Amino acid sequence: MLISLALLAGCDDRAAMAARDDGDPMQYGGVSGLNYTPYYIHTFNVKGHDDNGISGGGPNIQPASPDNMPSGGGKETCCASFHKKWRPGLKVTVRWIANKKLDGIAWGAWYKAEAEVPEYGTATYGMWAIFLPGDRVKVMIKDGNANGHNRVWARPADDDPYVGTGTVDEELTRQDEERREKQRQMKIAREAELAREAELSKQHETTQ
């Protein structure tokens, strides 16, 4: 299931602000990711809890290198929304597709994890999701590491309190599998129809 994002104009990482009804201003930025796992990540999305306004979806990310260097970071998608001013308790749910079968055929399963966004400064440069072994993930707002929590290229510590541990999202995976099976059956039916049309056309030509 592809998660669609509203494409917002002017997706500068320093971002224009949008005022919320509660007076808590939001801003927009790009979404990027790093992958420390050996598995391909097809897509991911972030959604805030309790309608806190945080949202975003990121690009696909290749597996980490054999020497455990992360992949990703070279591209971003538009756009994430997050608070101009950080406050404690900004929690999000992250969902992503990871292909662990490594057979080049399987699509992979959806995973989900809950995490809290660490403190960030006022000069921000977009949202980042850092995927770690053990189905773990950290979501941060890049800010030049103003408060010591958001060094994008430093692997989070194993005991980092802002790292959430995920589980398979059984329902979303099932829905995705059903959708793909329906598409597969439609493709088979269409190919069979085209084959019948070709055979009828061939028979018609031989009778002329």
Model-derived regions, located:
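Structural beta-strand segments of beta-rich domains
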Residues: Q27-G29
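Bacterial signal peptide processing site
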Residues: C11-A15
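Beta-strand-rich cores of mature extracytoplasmic or soluble domains
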Residues: R87-Q208
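Asparagine-centered strand-capping/turn motif at beta-strand->loop junctions
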Residues: S32-Y36
